[in-house]
Regions:
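Hydrophobic beta-strand-centered segment that forms part of the acyl-chain substrate-binding groove
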Residues: 37-45, 49-96
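Homeobox/homeodomain signature
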Residues: 5-8, 18, 24, 34, ...
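Catalytic strand-loop segment that frames the active site of acyl-thioester-processing enzymes
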Residues: 1-43
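HotDog/MaoC-like acyl-thioester-processing domains
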Residues: 1-6, 79-118
Length: 118
């Protein structure tokens, strides 16, 4: 199996759309002043938005969403608007994928990421 990867540059519009679709209107995802008041650099992308993109890449690598059985990851870093993250999946043995999500600075934003498929 070849390596599958997708590069995504996060935008305020994308983060807002995810907030509306998911119902997660936590102000750290929508209000820069609030986010800074709690020690964040500003608005950050939802972890589950990132995981959803990673799951999409894993599904493609597994041969379709119906083949994906499990996906694991740890939310390890913040993604801010303007950050570009490369999400990737590659073979890790029969029915297993190693997954990565790395920003433009080379920092892993999702770690301990893997998937199982049938």
């Amino acid at each position: 199996m070849k390596r599958i990867q997708r590069e995504v540059t996060f935008s305020i519009a994308q983060i807002d759309a995810y907030a509306d679709a998911s119902g997660d209107h936590n102000p750290i995802h929508r209000d820069g002043d609030f986010a800074r008041s709690v020690g964040l650099p500003g608005v950050i992308a939802h972890g589950l938005l990132q995981m959803g993109i990673l799951a999409s890449v894993a599904s493609e690598a597994a041969g379709g969403a119906g083949r994906l059985r499990r996906i694991y990851c740890r939310f390890a870093g913040m993604v801010e608007p303007g950050d570009t993250v490369t999400f990737a999946a590659e073979d890790a043995g029969p029915g297993k994928l190693m997954l990565t999500a790395v920003n433009q600075r080379g920092d892993a934003v999702l770690t301990k990421a893997s998937a199982e498929y049938r």
